[in-house]
UniProtKB/Swiss-Prot annotation:
Transmembrane segment boundaries: none
Uppermost EC category: transferase
Highest taxon of source: Bacteria
One GO cellular component, as annotated: cytosol
The protein's required cofactors: [4Fe-4S] cluster
Phylogenetic placement of the source organism: Bacteria, Pseudomonadati, Campylobacterota, Epsilonproteobacteria, Campylobacterales
GO biological processes: tRNA modification
Chain ranges of the Radical SAM core domain: 137-365
Name the UniProt record assigns to this protein: Ribosomal protein uS12 methylthiotransferase RimO
Family statement: Belongs to the methylthiotransferase family. RimO subfamily.
Amino acid sequence: MQIKENKQLCLISLGCSKNLVDSEVMLGKLYNYTLTNDTKSADVILINTCGFIESAKQESIQTILNAAKDKKKGAILIASGCLSERYKDEIKELIPEVDIFTGVGDYDKIDIMIAKKQNQFSEQVFLSEHYNARIITGSSVHAYVKISEGCNQKCSFCAIPSFKGKLQSRELDSILKEAENLALKGYTDMTFIAQDSSSFLYDKGQKDGLIQLISAIDKQQALKSARILYLYPSSTTLELISTIESSPIFQNYFDMPIQHISDSMLKKMRRNSSQAHHLKLLDAMKQVKESFIRSTIIVGHPEENEGEFEELSAFLDEFRFDRLNIFAFSAEENTHAYSLEKVPKKIINARIKALNKIALKHQNNSFKALLNKPIKALVENKEGEYFYKARDLRWAPEVDGEILINDSELATPLKPGHYTIMPSAFKDNILLAKVLSPF
């Protein structure tokens, strides 16, 4: 029997879903604490930070300072994760309010650090395995599964390899065991994640690692649905797209950050790819029946000229991505682009405004295309007093949209799980739908 300590833990997980997996591992080590969202009453405040770009760093620092102001006498404030790792040599002096610092190598030792009240920074980046206990958050039917850490790409703008290291793939058997264990607990929808998912097993000399994973998950038959995030263009192939299309479990969801479409900009960004390769992959994705395509764009990278931007703008309007994230270039230390001559902020802001207008138009059309059609969806939980929260099975959690189901139209309460639903109305990035049947 697990005995709860009479102590409260407030965990704040910032940044990406990969960070969330590490946060859930820490929760697994601290299972004997009572969870709270109140930083003022918590005995331990644990902030898993993000250090990817300037805005994320500022959010992490502000969250730490707010927690330091709120924490009660005797409470322990911990800063873990990417920000701590990236600035480990100076962060202790910059933010003395923190009691314990740790980076990206010791999530599974958080209980020991708290007991000893000491910092810890291991050289090896931590990679969650099937035997690491996790407390899944946010859903009783969906879980993230991290398949690798680190990245071997050399993008001009990205600092991730400097603090996450080179590509480190999990063994396929470990991933299958984790998927099976989670499915037995009711988590039958999964999102597989990494910094560069399409390079899975490249570090072990295998170029078809992700194809192997998809085939093995299909054969295992433990899951009902899954999707993959963060495909990298240079390691994505037509065979991979075809494998996803033919899978009975993996959805026709293609999340491939292209960052730009101009050949000259792709070269400046050191993306190790070309416009022709991008177009070949994107066209193949669009040919897949009921495909959903998401991407990410960086605006204002050093030396981006007006012609290159216009080429990008015209392409985005023509291709019509279902979802598009648009970021302003962030100058990051230890990157090639850091010291290059910058595009003025005024120009960057104007370009972002223009692209956001294009992205919103096509996003709304993507939502509206689902109206009055039966779609497969995952119902996750109650949203307020009157609605259940759901999402299209092709969507990733949190980022791609929300579907609400009015409980007044139901004969009996819904259990979280897989349903066929019919969206009937759309407003403010939310679809309203009714349930047709479970599946």
